[in-house]
């Protein structure tokens, strides 16, 4: 199993990061993609990817941090992306839910990162919340120039999902789908994701699966819980968990070009 979304740079992991990685490996996780959400976090993620043989990282600026994007940021992201442990540009995209950066700042940073990914021929690791139409409008001109793209932590509608799949995007599914309050619609969409376009992730330390038992006292999510998410996704799709694990692993290798 490969976890395509781990925020291992989070302060929630500062005291036991080695143990978190050890527990993940013991739980059957064979690889992890560490998410970079701004320049500093991307640099830290790359250092952690160097430290742990089972980890790779992304380099990019999250829409929340898009106000930080400047020409110096771009130069630093490009330099970082040339490191062998960095296998995708992102986390980038649009988030019009809370607009921590203005829509204009988000669009500027997103388009710049799409251009970088195209120039470096690297896949993009993307985020979209309450911005689907504009997200696709900005992404569309770049699709034939990119080697691949994943929309991580998908929580949209069936129509939005189909529009993403029709454009060749991979779909990242998190423990959100295990939430009996807000994940039911996503759960119903699982069978409509082509197996060859499905990826799984924890988004740890966030999105602890609500149906996990026993729940950790800290309420912190970990990559070790990926097995639980995969088992639930396989159940709701009517597939064998081992087959789905092998299939999603193959998807990771295809999209990110890594061996694990």
UniProtKB/Swiss-Prot annotation:
Pfam families in UniProt: TatD_DNase
Organism annotation: Citrobacter koseri (strain ATCC BAA-895 / CDC 4225-83 / SGSC4696)
Summary of the function given for this chain in its UniProt record: 3'-5' exonuclease that prefers single-stranded DNA and RNA. May play a role in the H(2)O(2)-induced DNA damage repair.
Lineage per the UniProt record: Bacteria, Pseudomonadati, Pseudomonadota, Gammaproteobacteria, Enterobacterales
Name of this protein: 3'-5' ssDNA/RNA exonuclease TatD
Coiled coil: none
GO molecular function, one term: magnesium ion binding
Cofactor(s) needed for function: Mg(2+)
Presence of the UniProt keyword Oxidoreductase in the record: no
CDD domains reported for this sequence: TatD_DNAse
Binding locations of a divalent metal cation: 91, 127, 152
Top enzyme category: hydrolase
Subunit structure of this chain's protein: Monomer.
Lipid metabolism keyword on record: no
PANTHER family: DEOXYRIBONUCLEASE TATDN1, TATD FAMILY DEOXYRIBONUCLEASE
Annotated EC: 3.1.11.-, 3.1.13.-
